[in-house]
């Protein structure tokens, strides 16, 4: 009796004996689909990574351009101030011309 119960349990739990295996063309089609899907996912991942890297590089490029523009404005401002101070010191070095009585 115990053997009979074990035999029935074994038969019921092993579903592979009851169903037929899939036909080879169907299995090949599934395999081809899986290969395509895997490769397509890899391609999409690479494209996404490339886009993210390009976005990061563009943002860095914009920051560098802003910093250069800011530096250029600061240099222009410093040069203008330096030029103004030089001109003022030159003008202060010249004696002031007073109208002479001879003229």
UniProtKB/Swiss-Prot annotation:
Residues 1-19 form the signal peptide. The keyword Secreted applies. One of its GO terms (molecular function) is neuropeptide hormone activity. It comes from the Eukaryota. GO terms for cellular component: extracellular space; terminal bouton. It holds the Pfam family Hormone_2. The keyword Secreted applies. Residues 20-30, 74-103 form a propeptide. Keywords: Secreted, Signal. It is found in: Secreted. One of its GO terms (biological process) is adenylate cyclase-activating G protein-coupled receptor signaling pathway. Belongs to the glucagon family. GRF is released by the hypothalamus and acts on the adenohypophyse to stimulate the secretion of growth hormone. This is Somatoliberin. It comes from Mus musculus (Mouse). The lineage of its organism: Eukaryota, Metazoa, Chordata, Craniata, Vertebrata.
């Amino acid at each position: 009796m115990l053997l009979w119960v074990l035999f029935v349990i074994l038969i019921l739990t092993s579903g592979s004996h009851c169903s037929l295996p899939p036909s080879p063309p169907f299995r090949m089609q599934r395999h081809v689909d899986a290969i395509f899907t895997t490769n397509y996912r890899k391609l999409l991942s690479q494209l996404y990574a490339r886009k993210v890297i390009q976005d990061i590089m563009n943002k860095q490029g914009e920051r560098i351009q802003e910093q250069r523009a800011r530096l250029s404005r600061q240099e222009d401002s410093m040069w203008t101030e330096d030029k103004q101070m030089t001109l003022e010191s030159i003008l202060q070095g010249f004696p002031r011309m007073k109208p002479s009585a001879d003229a």
